[in-house]
Amino acid sequence: MYEHIPVLLEESTSYLVTKPDGIYVDATFGLGGHSKKILEKLSSNGFLVAIDKDEEAIELGKEKFKKCNNIKIVHSPFSRLDEVLNFLKIDKIDGILFDLGVSSLQLDKPERGFSYNSDSFLDMRMDKTSKLTAYDVVNKYSEKELERIIREYGEERYAKKIAKEIVKRREQKPITTTKELNDLINSVVPRPKDGSNPAKRTFQAIRIEVNGELEEIKVALEKSIRFLKSGGRICVISFHSLEDRIVKEFFKYHSLECICPKDIPVCVCGKKKELNILTKKPITPTKEEIERNKRSHSAKLRVAEKI
């Protein structure tokens, strides 16, 4: 079994579960750490829908929770939240939790091709039924496309240099493994002062491209509002600035009453306020949690409540 330490576990689930007999969604089931805690907070009348796009996570989860009657585990990307809830004949929910990014299961299994610390095929698919792999991105995208992805999704200042080197190397032979890509990046990018691996940002960028992560988040957040009851909550844990920015802007937009230009004296947009932001500043892990689980260091939790 893979080691899995859920991030901001008590903080996120305490905000999420306000009614023990309510209906909740764990939109990023993973290895079930948050789901387990949510179920502990629910009464026998409460119900949890757990969603994940990773089939392996679903199979492990079904085995782990096979004796539990008030959870339904579904294989689906969270961007199809509406289809999942409609299929289950659920009209409204009391809360939804998103724990974004790559899971421990995906990172810790070398053959999944997510980690720059392993030597395995460049895969990076969260859903193994999807077609696009990291190999395709690295070996088939143009230099301009690679540069854009690495710059935008990795926020990497050396994007141009890395893209150029990828194209140069792949002309000699395809880049097939995580180690090859890691070594390539390390050969052209100086090591940061904090000692972290220079490949980190590029691997993040390629992973986001392969899985369409940012667009999925935007779609899922919009859909979640439609299903939330009044008083229901959206809790989102993000791990890098791109994710956090999407969540922050989404919460801000839906917490505004009017978006008309300031020089218009009377509101004509007709926009209604839908959310109250409960976390003015994001909640971050304690020093103790970071010491216990290094992967939690960049986590941020934001919470909003449906009006």
UniProtKB/Swiss-Prot annotation:
Q: Could you state a single Gene Ontology molecular function term?
A: rRNA (cytosine-N4-)-methyltransferase activity
Kindly state one GO CC term assigned in the UniProt record.
cytoplasm
Q: Which domain of life is it from?
A: Bacteria
Quote the subcellular location field of this record. Cytoplasm
Picking any one GO biological process from the record gives:
rRNA base methylation
Top-rank EC class of the record's enzyme: transferase
Residues holding S-adenosyl-L-methionine = G32, G33, H34, D52, F78, D99, Q106
Q: Kindly state which reaction or reactions the protein catalyses.
A: cytidine(1402) in 16S rRNA + S-adenosyl-L-methionine = N(4)-methylcytidine(1402) in 16S rRNA + S-adenosyl-L-homocysteine + H(+)
Main localisation: cytoplasm
Which InterPro entries does the record cross-reference, listed alphabetically?
A: RsmH, SAM-dep_MeTrfase_MraW_recog, SAM-dependent_MTases_sf
Keyword check for Oxidoreductase: no
Q: What keyword terms does UniProt attach to this protein?
A: Cytoplasm, Methyltransferase, rRNA processing, S-adenosyl-L-methionine, Transferase
Which Enzyme Commission number(s) are listed?
2.1.1.199
Query: What family is it from?
Result: Belongs to the methyltransferase superfamily. RsmH family.
Q: Which HAMAP family match?
A: 16SrRNA_methyltr_H
Its biological purpose is as follows:
Specifically methylates the N4 position of cytidine in position 1402 (C1402) of 16S rRNA.
Which named protein is this?
Ribosomal RNA small subunit methyltransferase H
